[in-house]
Amino acid sequence: RKINLPVLLMAGGIGSRLKPLTNVFPKALIPIGEKTILEQIIDSFLEYQCEKFYISVNYKSDMIKYYLNSLNNHNYEVHFVEEKEFLGTAGSIKLASEFIDSTFFVSNCDILIDDDYANILDFHKESKNEITIVAAIMQSSIPYGVLETNNEGQLIEINEKPEYYYKINSGLYILEPSVFKYIP
């Protein structure tokens, strides 16, 4: 289904968790199969006819620009949003405010989301959200019996090898342009 919204891709980070790979390449250009992770993410949005991409760059930005500009066969627009210093997600969103004036996606450049972007957009619109953060469900198991005690140290319960489920930020968002006013 066609949704055709602008997409802000966060490609300015150092990628310290991916070192030593990111000593050579920015994380956006790490290969996943035959393409870079950045191309994989762009392709996932192209399936929904999102054809306008704003890429927030800082670390090794020249490599990212050169690489994307060298792709001759792309049928989408790419605009670069320059972070002169590391600003983080909110800072990059604020910089993009001079280019974006409609509902838009924000995606980290180091995640691959296997979900229906049109359904996420429907949820966002039906909920009348200014910001929708897409969560991933994570599970942790503790391989021991966990003791629950009262304030005096008396045993109340033993939970044997409990499992916990929680939601984490997946790095994919939908925002309304009204959020720009909240960012200093």
Positions of predicted regions on the chain:
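Conserved nucleotide-sugar donor-binding
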Residues: 101-102, 171-182
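A conserved hydrophobic position in a structured secondary element of the catalytic/binding core
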Residues: 59, 107, 174-175
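Short, flexible, basic/aromatic active-site loop/helix in glycosyltransferases
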Residues: 149-166
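Residues that recognize and position ribonucleotide moieties
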Residues: 30, 105, 166, 172-173
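Conserved beta-loop-beta/alpha segment of the NTase-like Rossmann-fold superfamily
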Residues: 65, 69-151
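Short beta-strand-to-turn element immediately C-terminal to the catalytic PLP-Schiff-base lysine
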Residues: 32, 147-150, 174-175
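N-terminal glycine-rich phosphate-binding loop and ensuing alpha1 helix
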Residues: 3-62
